[in-house]
């Protein structure tokens, strides 16, 4: 086809471009605003409250620790998107998941300083999908338990390389070589540029916060000094690289030597002899909010369901009081669940258990106290039996649980006024009590 000659087509083209420019200048904010309507801002702390864009944020969310693992392979990656979409439809704002897998199958960190790019891209996918669905992520950085490597794997690496001081798992906290391993991992992770979004993790507001370690215990030093020293060092190191994100420890919430008057709140005596100390650990200067777990099934041996419910209320109110008076920081209950393996278990008990916990948070939020929200342990989708435990739930298969989750989202949204600004909240909450 011959190239056009003369000025014939030029005037119509210029007219078209002029029209486009006029539309853009006149209505561009409205048109392109649709693309940025769901953009997330960094979550910050104002005293005992989380805030986003100057408004309080109360968290209603869940745990799906398995996201990165399932995002590695094509055949299972869709589960991440499906769970995030389902969470968003329930109005859930935060999902807690693992940003670690040390050694073993689908390891992110194969050995100290060696990373599998394939698995890193899986984590990139998780973060990008969360952003797409408007859900923030609480990313945990290492496990106290052996699952997915944890501190045991770090100790084994040091031992295998002939630099370990001890074969004890607790040497993770005091061995200089292991501390260097962990700091190197932190540096690589925090400065990772997402292959899908082009944003470094430390600059991505999709990440709600970092969790230093899941359920830390250091039973070789019940004074708590060893764990406290490690927390202080590692949190300062993280903040030197990333001062934009919030940071929490990842505690279960057990009281230690620094709170002698609170020891009776612990489930049993053993809980004060784990080397962790809720108030002292959470009061570390670089910790932005406290984290607490709720597992009466694991913590008591002979109590019935009604006794467990009473404990839950006492446990939560005690920690909220700490947030208000001692720490002056938000308190987020980052795991809670009721086992379906109890000998007297009935599905209706789970409804009451969830309702009790949600009511405590709702009342705290109404009074602008430090109870900042909850994360259910754990949500799955169909076909994940191998990842289920006695706490796992496919929420849309249990209508009563799904209704409770949506109701809590709406209640918390109304307190902050966010339902007046967000179309999703308006639609979801318009017929809710």
Swiss-Prot record:
GO molecular function: mannan endo-1,4-beta-mannosidase activity
Localization: Secreted
Main localization (coarse): secreted
Binding annotation for substrate: 98, 214, 295, 377
Cellular component per GO, a single term: extracellular region
The keyword Ion transport is annotated on this UniProt entry: no
Protein's name in the database: Mannan endo-1,4-beta-mannosidase 2
Gene: MAN2
């Amino acid at each position: 086809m011959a190239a056009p000659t003369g000025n014939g087509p030029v005037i119509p083209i210029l007219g078209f471009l002029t029209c486009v420019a006029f539309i853009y200048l006149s209505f561009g904010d409205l048109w392109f605003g649709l693309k940025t309507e769901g953009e997330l801002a960094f979550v910050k702390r104002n005293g005992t409250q989380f805030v986003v864009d100057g408004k309080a944020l109360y968290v209603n969310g869940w745990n799906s620790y398995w996201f990165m693992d399932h995002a590695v392979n094509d055949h299972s990656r869709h589960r991440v998107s499906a769970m995030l979409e389902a969470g968003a439809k329930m109005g859930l704002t935060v999902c807690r998941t693992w940003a670690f897998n040390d050694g073993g199958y689908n390891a992110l960190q194969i050995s100290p300083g060696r990373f599998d790019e394939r698995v890193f891209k899986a984590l990139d996918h998780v973060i990008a999908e969360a952003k797409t669905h408007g859900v923030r992520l609480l990313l945990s950085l290492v496990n106290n338990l052996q699952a997915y490597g944890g501190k045991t794997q770090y100790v084994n690496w040091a031992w295998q390389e002939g630099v370990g001081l001890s074969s004890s798992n607790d040497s993770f906290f005091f061995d200089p070589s292991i501390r260097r391993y962990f700091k190197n991992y932190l540096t690589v992770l925090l400065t990772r540029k997402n292959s899908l979004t082009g944003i470094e993790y430390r600059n991505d507001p999709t990440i709600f916060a970092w969790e230093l370690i899941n359920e830390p215990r250091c039973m070789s030093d019940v004074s708590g000094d060893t764990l406290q020293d490690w927390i202080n060092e590692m949190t300062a190191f993280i903040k030197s690289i990333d001062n934009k994100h919030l940071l929490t420890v990842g505690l279960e919430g057990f009281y230690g030597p620094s709170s002698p008057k609170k020891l009776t709140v612990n489930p049993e005596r053993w809980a004060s002899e784990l080397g962790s100390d809720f108030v002292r650990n959470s009061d570390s200067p670089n910790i932005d909010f406290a984290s607490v777990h709720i597992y009466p099934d694991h913590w008591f041996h002979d109590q019935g369901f009604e006794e467990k419910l009473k404990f839950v209320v006492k446990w939560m109110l005690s920690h909220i009081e700490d947030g208000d008076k001692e720490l002056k920081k938000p308190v987020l209950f980052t795991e809670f669940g009721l086992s379906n393996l109890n000998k007297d278990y009935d599905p209706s008990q789970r409804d009451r258990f969830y309702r009790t916990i949600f009511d405590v948070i709702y009342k705290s939020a109404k009074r602008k106290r430090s109870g900042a929200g909850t994360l259910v342990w754990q949500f799955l989708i169909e076909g994940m039996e191998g990842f289920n435990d006695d706490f796992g739930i496919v929420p849309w298969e249990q209508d009563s649980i799904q209704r409770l989750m949506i109701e809590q989202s709406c209640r918390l949204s109304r307190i902050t006024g966010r339902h007046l600004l967000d179309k999703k909240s308006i639609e979801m909450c318009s017929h809710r009590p």
